[in-house]
């Protein structure tokens, strides 16, 4: 049995992913998205940036031949090389056996397979758990750093350091550092006194091995038992963690086939564990559950139990339900850190809205997702440019749909404003450049029954200020029109740009008061039979289709980067088309919610 640092990292994030990486059918893997490939390149570039200031040597060996890699690394260590990049450390007696093993390399052990001869031997872990199989542990720290101290090599020894794009020393990084240190101890005959993470902006960060070693051994034991016993973990869909995984389609299909509770918004892993102890394991049993009894458990605080039960009822009936009045009032004005207690919020991290849009993209970086691909890119010397995938439209797009031929009379709605003229606003951004390059506005004139889309596009970063001014001019062309948007990114960006470009308060503060967050309105007033309260699932449930079916916010990040490199204007057209559809989808959701609330009142 082969256990690599990559596999252990996957196991910490998702047990099922580690199982499928080892035992799954690789033909079922999703191809990596353009966004994931972009993250890989970004991670490679960051490692190159760090290594520019280091003098290092690297072991060379046939790809996937860990034994050859370990021998080459050992030779460099015996020579006393100061820095060794991507050395191979193996815990086991080389040459005892030479069974063919499949090693997972590439995109965090997802997309490529190599066959390498890896020797195996029984590994005696620092735990009481017996293992029947022969086990080989393979570690590939980003750097082995020489330091004073006796070892089998002489009066020097080594410590490990991993380069992460993240700003935070996350626990899974620290566990991997402890794994490196454990195997390094057997190679050099001395237990390392420390292990290091090299973090963006923070630099070197020391891992407390005394604290992390016991945790590492416990995690390692569980991982070995899972693979040894072929004990496939239960599927669980967690949108934040699953979206970029190569097994997403496989796992989601399995979850759909059994109507798994993790597909319900609000059913987190902790809550699902509690529900299982109560023998509530399907949608019907949750829909019939007593929410007052659920509320006695700490996993269901602050009326969450009621909302989760109602969510199951909505799915069972396949119809929307009115959220309880008291719950809506309690949530009004509450600023959330992360996700709502009910998790009826955008479930991703690429944007705060559809597919997640984060102001801090570094929290979703390629070092976390693909910790091993960067060395493959560095070894190839030249980074191959990412090709635009098939979801970039080549043929002319279908015309934008004309929505709502019979608009709701302004006087009928007392729940959500229906104005003679309404503005629907959506932004596209390039987070790494801190650039908001597209302000899309759909102007809906209900009186004249017209709809017109305005796309204020910056073809380079230098034009951001100009499109900001153009956008403001349009807002003041309709001085009392409400401005509808989905999630709070538009509000945050509006404030940021006003400050950045020293906009007088009288030009932007009155406009800010006209913003209405449709996402907030939906999540506070309705419960819908959707998997996520992001824009796409809601609008699609209502029958709206994007003209570019596979386009999303992450793809737009890739498209804009490709535009800057190629100057291909068809790329800009695809971005603007997607942005317009986002505005129109927001329009659909807003009109539906107004009608829904009106019907509930009647």
Give the residues covered by each predicted segment:
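Metal-dependent nuclease catalytic cores that hydrolyze phosphodiester bonds in DNA/RNA
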Residues: 1-114, 123-153
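Long, low-complexity intrinsically disordered regions
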Residues: 135-139, 153, 157-159, 172-175, ...
